[in-house]
Each structure stands twice: as structure tokens, then as C-alpha cells.
């Protein structure tokens, strides 16, 4: 996969390059918006990763110029600005998605794949854990074919658990995912969200348990016990 990264912070750019190259992506990097526009026009990329705070011009201007130039390459904004108005503006200018820094490698890779699939008309991205199905594109959750209605925060937590299935996630990781370092509440709010999320899943799944507590560390999403699934 060919990726154009437009990012002026050399440390962040190097970190993202390492993330992508570990997945065998071909990454082309520039720290200037003007050069990013030229590269985006001249060459074919599967996706463009765009920072908003560039030294020569705004990332929004890069995005707007590319779209006015009929460049249809999918664009994922990677920004430290977590405000709703920033996200709405970016999507309004033609971005395909918006991720707030910092982010985890697994989520970045999953979102890139989902965006590229959509751009090529492929099927929606779905993560299945037992009878639990999380649709990353439609942002819906089902258990045994029955829709589970979650709040925005509950869905974000389940999405992160699904993306990192089998990996223990700390409460700090959840807080960062939910709030992006902005006005974060106390850690105990994560326990409250997990409790509500479990109740909603249990109401549909019955005896199946998906979210496991790892005492002193955090939470993990695991496949439900096979024997329990068969007896349910």
C-alpha cells in the first residue's frame, strides 16, 4: 500500500513511518503542505495522512486544494486538535476520517484499511468475537444478529477493545481514546462505562461474557468460552 504522509513534526513522522512500514506499507513523507499538494497531484497513493499544523500552510488548505484539483485519494487527518468543530471542518473540506493524536498503531492501521476498502468499494470492516459483531464503518454492534444500542462513549470503548482483541487495555488508554487528553475525568469513569457496556451486552448475550477484568491492569476483550457458547 502506498501512503503519502504530510507531517512537519519529525519525531511524530518517524513514529508513524515505523508503524506503517512494520505493516509493509510504502511511505512517502513531506513536512510541507505545498510539496504534499504537488505529490498528491502527481502520483497515485492509496491514502494520504495529513497533519493540520504545517509550517507553510494550513492542513485545511492542503485538503481543500487537493479536492478542488479533483484528487480523489482518500485523506485521513491526524491532528492534536480534538475539538468537534475541528473534526466537522476537516470532514466538511473532504477528509474521509479524522483521528486525534496520540493514537495506537492498531487503530491507525485498522482505520487506514477501512478507508481504503470504502474508497475501492469493498465490503464494510467487521470484527467478530464469538456472536459479537462490531461494524467499524457503520459503527453498529450486534450480538447473535440482535442490535445493541450503545452511547457514543460505550461504542468507542467497545471499538477499541475489538481493535485490540486479546490485549489488556489500561484505564489510561481508554481515557486517552475517549477524551484525547482534553478535560479528562477521573479514571473511575472507565469502570462505570465498562459496567454499563457489560450490562447491555449481557442483556442480549445471556451467559456469554466478552469483557474480562484483568485486576490491577485493565480490561480485555476475549472470545467467549467455546463450551459455554455451545450450551447457551
UniProtKB/Swiss-Prot annotation:
PROSITE patterns: OMPR_PHOB (PS51755), RESPONSE_REGULATORY (PS50110)
Keywords, in A-Z order: Cytoplasm, DNA-binding, Phosphoprotein, Transcription, Transcription regulation, Two-component regulatory system
DNA-binding region(s), residue ranges: 124-223
Membrane-spanning residues: none
SMART domains recorded: REC, Trans_reg_C
Domain Response regulatory: from-to ranges: 2-116
A Pfam family assignment: Response_reg
Any Gene Ontology CC annotation: protein-DNA complex
Entry-annotated residues carrying 4-aspartylphosphate: 51
Location(s), subcellular: Cytoplasm
Highest taxon, organism lineage: Bacteria
Chief localization: cytoplasm
Disulfide pattern: none
BP-aspect Gene Ontology terms: regulation of DNA-templated transcription
Molecular-function GO terms, alphabetical: phosphorelay response regulator activity; transcription cis-regulatory region binding
Described purpose of this protein according to its UniProt entry: Essential protein that plays a role in the control of cell division, possibly through the transcriptional regulation of ccrM, rpoD, pleC, minC and ftsZ genes.
Matches recorded under NCBIfam families: RespRegCtrARhodob (NF045991)
Name of the protein in its database record: Cell cycle response regulator CtrA
Native species: Brucella anthropi (strain ATCC 49188 / DSM 6882 / CCUG 24695 / JCM 21032 / LMG 3331 / NBRC 15819 / NCTC 12168 / Alc 37)
Amino acid at each position: 500500500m502506498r501512503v503519502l504522509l504530510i507531517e512537519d513534526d519529525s519525531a511524530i513522522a518517524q513514529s508513524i513511518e515505523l508503524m506503517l512500514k512494520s505493516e509493509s506499507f510504502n511511505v512517502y513523507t513531506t513536512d510541507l503542505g505545498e510539496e504534499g499538494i504537488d505529490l498528491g497531484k502527481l502520483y497515485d497513493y492509496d491514502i494520504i495522512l495529513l497533519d493540520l499544523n504545517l509550517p507553510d500552510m494550513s492542513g485545511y488548505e492542503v485538503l481543500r486544494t487537493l479536492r478542488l484539483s479533483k484528487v480523489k485519494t482518500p485523506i485521513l487527518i491526524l491532528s492534536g486538535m480534538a475539538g468537534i468543530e475541528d473534526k466537522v471542518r476537516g470532514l466538511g473540506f473532504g477528509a474521509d476520517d479524522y483521528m486525534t493524536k496520540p493514537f495506537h498503531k492498531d487503530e491507525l492501521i485498522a482505520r487506514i484499511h477501512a478507508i481504503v476498502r470504502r474508497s475501492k468499494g469493498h465490503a464494510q470492516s467487521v470484527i467478530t468475537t464469538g456472536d459479537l459483531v462490531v461494524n467499524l464503518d457503520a459503527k453498529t454492534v450486534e450480538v447473535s444478529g440482535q442490535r445493541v444500542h450503545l452511547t457514543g462513549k460505550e461504542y468507542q470503548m467497545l471499538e477499541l477493545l475489538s481493535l485490540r482483541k486479546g490485549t489488556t487495555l489500561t484505564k489510561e488508554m481508554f481515557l486517552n481514546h475517549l477524551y484525547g487528553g482534553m478535560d479528562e475525568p477521573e479514571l473511575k469513569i472507565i469502570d462505570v462505562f465498562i459496567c454499563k457496556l457489560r450490562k447491555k451486552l449481557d442483556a442480549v448475550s445471556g451467559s456469554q461474557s466478552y469483557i474480562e477484568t484483568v485486576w490491577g491492569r485493565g480490561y480485555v476483550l476475549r472470545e467467549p468460552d467455546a463450551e459455554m457458547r455451545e450450551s447457551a
